[in-house]
């Protein structure tokens, strides 16, 4: 909890999110779940947490169960977001001001056995969210990823073709 409180109290322009609807996909994952907790700790943001694992969400977000600012819905990003509102009790056409896309099948086993399906799901999922956001007045979109997308490589600083990719190369 100390890290969550520390992040929530960071000197950021939080006022831009005050009263806004923020969608966090991958909310039952490590990064998405932490982002949900930081946003909820702020106390003035409407958080819509979306994930595939409803049981995990009930345990992880139990303290927010009766909080009117917290909403969880089961969602697989490979489906258009508009399908969710038609097939569930969620309000249709929620205007998400900000979308934080932290959902992906991060399982190495899934990528090893069905890499094309995993890649397609990531591409279509991102496209689905961007299209929904554009149609509903989204202000900003944040895509969360990992260095794993670059693969193992094998290059070093001394590789004849040039230096290896470093985190500092990307800011």
What are these regions (language model features)?
Residues 97-100, 142:
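N-terminal Rossmann-like NAD(P) cofactor-binding module of classical short-chain dehydrogenase/reductase
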Residues 103-106, 145-146:
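Conserved NAD(P)H cofactor-binding loop of Rossmann-fold oxidoreductase domains
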Residues 108-125:
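Short alpha-helical oligomerization interface
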